[in-house]
């Protein structure tokens, strides 16, 4: 489904306290669970119709293969894109003053797919990549931190000074060399993604619906991430 002007006009909008701990501060536009796909004809102009001073855009659980083109936007500080089909990161599409970016449970498998982080807004402090195959790579955290040294939090864990010191420091910020992915590893990656779907499908209908309702009513990033982790088969802590 294409994102149209009508989609924006009809999207739920509410105020929440996701970031600042104060009520009625952040304006949230909900575009989740609609099957939106990436395209470059209508979407760029459509996203310019977001309500004035939108702070959080929720594109969770769609069919996006590219970041939504929000490079023109200077009020969005949080972009929720978990459970899409994203496999590359074009930083020119990110909001100018983005602080929080949730890319959990997408299709990032290789460090090359994250090279765009080099050009991410300097305001980006919180990045979530949990549920992507790349999270299991050797030196994953150190490499991501090297690509985006301004990060303060990665996958819900504060970036430690020891991790910054261990990150590649040469002028090109080299990432671990990766050759062609072995067939066995490709199969493993596909199985991991299938397992996520399998876990969700095994939930009884009432439980799944209850979690989705809680997710729709969640008012903090921590609560959203907790419920999304449950949907992906993770353990609630």
Swiss-Prot record:
Q: Which residues form the LRRCT domain?
A: 132-170
Which Pfam families does this entry report, sorted A to Z? LRR_9
Q: Which SUPFAM superfamilies match?
A: L domain-like
PANTHER family (UniProt xref)? U2 SMALL NUCLEAR RIBONUCLEOPROTEIN A
Q: What does this protein do?
A: Involved in pre-mRNA splicing.
Question: Could you say which protein family the record assigns here?
Answer: Belongs to the U2 small nuclear ribonucleoprotein A family.
Q: What is this protein called?
A: U2 small nuclear ribonucleoprotein A'
User: What's the source species for this entry?
Assistant: Eremothecium gossypii (strain ATCC 10895 / CBS 109.51 / FGSC 9923 / NRRL Y-1056)
């Amino acid at each position: 489904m294409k994102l149209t002007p009508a989609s924006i006009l009809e999207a739920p909008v509410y105020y929440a306290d996701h970031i600042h701990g104060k009520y009625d501060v952040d304006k949230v536009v909900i575009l989740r669970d609609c099957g939106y796909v990436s395209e470059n004809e209508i979407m760029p102009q459509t996203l310019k119709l977001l309500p004035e001073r939108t702070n959080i855009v929720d594109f969770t659980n769609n069919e996006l293969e590219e970041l939504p083109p929000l490079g023109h936007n200077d009020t969005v500080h949080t972009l929720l894109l978990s459970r899409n089909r994203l496999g590359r990161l074009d930083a020119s599409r990110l909001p100018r003053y983005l602080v929080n970016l949730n890319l959990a449970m997408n299709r990032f498998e290789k460090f090359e797919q994250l090279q765009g982080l080099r050009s991410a807004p300097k305001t980006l402090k919180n990045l979530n990549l949990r549920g992507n195959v790349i999270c299991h790579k050797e030196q994953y955290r150190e490499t991501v931190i090297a690509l985006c040294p301004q990060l303060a939090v990665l996958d819900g864990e504060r970036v430690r000074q020891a991790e910054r010191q261990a990150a590649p420091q040469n002028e090109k910020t080299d990432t671990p060399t990766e050759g062609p992915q072995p067939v066995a590893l490709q199969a493993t990656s596909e199985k991991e993604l299938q397992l996520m779907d399998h876990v969700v499908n095994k939930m009884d209908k009432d439980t799944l619906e209850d979690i989705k309702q809680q997710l729709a009513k969640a008012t903090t990033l921590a609560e959203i991430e907790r419920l999304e982790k449950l949907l992906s088969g993770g353990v609630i802590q």
